[in-house]
């Protein structure tokens, strides 16, 4: 499977790298996996999960395969060399992972992410000790994305996101209160050349209007399956009530059994978790 995905490492390489990281003193390790490969064997996937659990990492990220354009896999699927990924098979493998990881003491706190139970923090942003032994250790870095917060990327290919208004030459009145995102040039030689010449390294930027920003808050926040999207946080972020903007979308998704609400926040149901892309798409312009 690793070779099929174009990875140059082996399963043994993973184990050796993991052991080396532990020996070096790392106490918080994540392992990434991709599932939903064409014709992927459920028993082989189950064995992969067992190997991951046996290593006992603090965090696991499991991503469903996406066939990206301009990749060898895309060409193979287009030419019929390999079949397209099967959504039903991917769903079966996903359910297997959810059940087995829960049994092994991992808490699913995001659509694709699990943390070992009891290693989280009371306030993930402040790093305060936890009193709840059921809380997982999260990926602090990605929480910024899922909460639609600001971040600055440095270096080739790095992405950044800032809210407006702020002092930036591209800011316009129409973008006020929303945001701006940009990315740097990817090839390292070209990036270095621009820096040495005193030229801008930004290759792409776009203003995010208020409606798009609100939709992204919903789309990203709903990925946090335990936390969801807080109505109070939405109000603070955008200056309006969530239900005033997305009344129709919320009503439809409630009726379809995709979303649930406790009055303070909106979260995915089990059905919504399995059909997350349909839910997320409902909030984008």
Tell where the protein language model's regions lie, with residue ranges.
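C-terminal scaffold of the Radical SAM
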Residues: 1-240
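Structural preference for long, well-ordered alpha-helical segments in enzyme cores
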Residues: 215-218, 249, 279
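Short amphipathic alpha-helical interaction segments
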Residues: 239-254
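Minor-groove-contacting beta-hairpin "wing" of winged helix-turn-helix DNA-binding domains
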Residues: 265-269
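A short, conserved structural fragment
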Residues: 254-264
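Short, amphipathic alpha-helical interaction segments positioned at domain boundaries
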Residues: 271-285
């Amino acid at each position: 499977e690793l070779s099929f995905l174009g990875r140059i490492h082996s399963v043994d390489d993973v184990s050796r790298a993991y052991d080396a990281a532990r020996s070096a003193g790392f106490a918080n390790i994540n392992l990434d996996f991709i599932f939903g490969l064409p014709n992927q064997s459920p028993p082989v996937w189950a064995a992969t999960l067992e190997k991951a659990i046996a290593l006992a990492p603090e965090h696991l990220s499991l991503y469903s395969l996406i066939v990206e354009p301009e990749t060898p896999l895309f060409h193979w699927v287009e030419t019929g060399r390999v079949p397209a990924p099967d959504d039903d098979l991917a769903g079966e493998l996903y359910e297997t992972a959810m059940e087995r990881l829960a049994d092994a003491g991992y808490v699913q706190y995001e659509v694709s992410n699990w943390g070992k139970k009891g290693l989280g923090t009371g306030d993930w942003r402040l790093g305060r000790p936890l009193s709840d032994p059921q809380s997982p250790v999260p990926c602090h870095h990605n929480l910024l994305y899922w909460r639609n917060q600001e971040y600055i990327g440095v270096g080739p290919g790095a992405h950044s996101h800032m809210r407006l208004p702020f002092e930036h030459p591209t800011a316009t009145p129409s973008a006020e209160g929303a945001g701006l995102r940009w990315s740097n040039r990817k090839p390292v030689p070209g990036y270095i050349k621009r820096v040495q010449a005193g030229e801008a390294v930004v290759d792409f930027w776009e203003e995010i209007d208020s409606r798009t920003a609100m939709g992204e808050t919903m789309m990203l926040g709903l990925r946090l399956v335990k936390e969801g999207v807080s109505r109070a946080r939405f109000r603070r972020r955008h200056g309006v009530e969530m239900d005033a903007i997305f009344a129709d979308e919320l009503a439809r998704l409630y009726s379809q059994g995709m979303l649930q609400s406790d009055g303070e926040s909106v979260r995915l149901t089990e059905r919504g978790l399995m059909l997350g892309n349909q839910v997320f798409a409902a909030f984008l312009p």
